């Protein structure tokens, strides 16, 4: 993704006026100790179709590299991320509860840091939701969306993964 952004920023294009640049809200989201920012990419709309296609494929390659990075950062990072994503998208309970909101923040931290450890300090994230909530939430989603090993049950997977991110070490 960094490569794709570098290519886009090198495109040039018509510079925007200061007033136009100030109209954009650069902060997309803020949670925990993180802030997600958006950037204007001047000239993107002026790229040829071939250049936009290149940007697309570079972005797809970056997404595949992200999974490799997750896997290299911790043995169970990819499994945990996929379980959390399955709950985030398929949870059938109340998404306004403090446990679900805490799980959402935890997932976003996992996305940002490519795993269950802080991207700078390397300390393990402590989730704000209970292991009971996690097990119940995992059981509420479609099993086909979970990263189950061959022959593994939903209960077994939830029981195996819960201590991996809910214990301090």
PLM feature spans:
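Sec-dependent signal peptide recognition
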Residues: 1-2
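C-terminal motif of bacterial Sec signal peptides marking the signal peptidase cleavage site
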Residues: 6-10
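Bacterial signal peptide processing site
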Residues: 12-14
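N- or domain-start disorder-to-order transition segments that initiate the globular core
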Residues: 17-20
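N-terminal helix-rich structural modules
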Residues: 22-169
